[in-house]
Amino acid sequence: MTCDDFRAEDEQPIEVDERRRRLKRKANDDDDDDETVRERVDDAESSMEVFEAEYPPILDPLQDQREAKYFRERMQRFDLYSRTTGLSVDDIDWPLIRGRSLQKGRVAGISFVYDDTRYPINRFSDTWLLCVTKQKLFSFGAGCVEDLNITSFVLRRTMKVLSTYCNWLFEAAKRNNRRHITHKEIQELINRDGFRFHQYLQKFLIGRGMEYTEYNNRFFKYLHEEYNKNPGGLETIYSNQDFIAKETAQANYIYDTVRAKYGGFEELPLFRHALKISFTQPGEHYFSRFYAKRFHEALGCPPLDSEIIMILDWFGVLIMNQIAYKTIRWHEEEYNDGSFPVLDSYHKALADESKCPKACLISISLFPDDPLFDLDIDYGTNPPPVNTAYQKVRRTPRDPTPFYRLMEFEDYKSCLVKMHFNFSELTGEWLRKICARGR
């Protein structure tokens, strides 16, 4: 076939479908049909605006099934642990609750020693949470608590405060347009109390060495200027003279109480073990990923495989410390008979803040709701005993699509410079110019 043949084929008239011709002729002849069609289109658009979902559903049915199954497994364990912790689905406001990873970066200066997640799940029991609470109360001078209602009361109050902290952190992350909690939100919460912020820096953000107790390097000076906005008050914020006095006063009181009531028992290895362990630290010198995952599930936040659980665990120890310290002071102010506090002492000491203002001025936060920070916490009524009937509550999974979109946007921003520039050539003055332009 030659070029002339192709040109001849192109010049041939194209046959138009007869049906299209009839429709076009009918549309030109009938003006009412155009108005009817326009009305139908407007009605369809308005109906789409009314019934359009807030976020499009997940298109992959297999992925949706896997996530729903993962969610049901984790929430089943949450239901199991909630009989001990007292938490319900109404206490949780996690934006991602379908088993997605919420944290990638490091937020603590310490990490897990080894991965022991190979242990079977039936090795963990919800009584471990009660056991840790009992040993922490013992190490804080509240005595060897044999009353299960006391241990349950302290544990449930601690978990309620922790869930409130987690909700606050995620709200702060959403305000900062982040899809997960970063060190910025954690420091924003802890910075509400200067003494706790000092403890946080000392425990999780170690400088050049443990001997540098004044934190005089440039990094902590930057933290101070960023979160306190007062460069002139650096010595006041981080000086040991302001914070060690409070910490020493409470530590000395607890030590004197333990020494007076235990009679030298504090020197035994059993007491040191009770002083070191926590919800994620079953031993004295290591953290356990296995127990950290179970603690995540007890809080209702699967799976959160990150170091943030260490900070939440540290919060839990501080909360129990404050509860025990305040109850002991209140019990001695009321009775002064050398006995250990009972359940009624815990209820009254934590319900009425005005009973012991002088005892609370040393180290206890003066806020009636929050033992550590100035947050509004609705405890409601006292939790029922452990042996009461339990009503299982299920929760439908939320749609995490907007958080996936935010994740893609953040990943794109993080690699934007790498996509347009070669870092091997960006040295010296060129890199400073790019940073100055805000790229």
UniProtKB/Swiss-Prot annotation:
The keyword Ligase does not apply. Transmembrane segments: none annotated. One of its GO terms (biological process) is sex differentiation. Residues 21-45 are annotated as: Disordered. Keywords: Developmental protein, Differentiation, Sexual differentiation, Spermatogenesis, Ubl conjugation pathway. Component of a complex containing fem-1, fem-2 and fem-3. Interacts with fem-1 and fem-2 (via N-terminus). Part of a E3 ubiquitin-protein ligase complex, at least composed of cul-2, elc-1, tra-1, fem-1, fem-2 and fem-3; mediates the ubiquitination and subsequent proteasomal degradation of tra-1. Interacts with tra-1. Interacts with sel-10. Interacts with tra-2. Required for male development. In XO (male) animals, fem-3 directs male differentiation in all tissues. In XX (hermaphrodite) animals, it specifies the first 80 or so germ cells to be sperm. Negatively regulates male development when bound to tra-2. Together with fem-2 associates with the CBC(fem-1) E3 ubiquitin-protein ligase complex which mediates the ubiquitination and subsequent proteasomal degradation of tra-1. This is Sex-determination protein fem-3. It comes from Caenorhabditis remanei. The gene is fem-3.
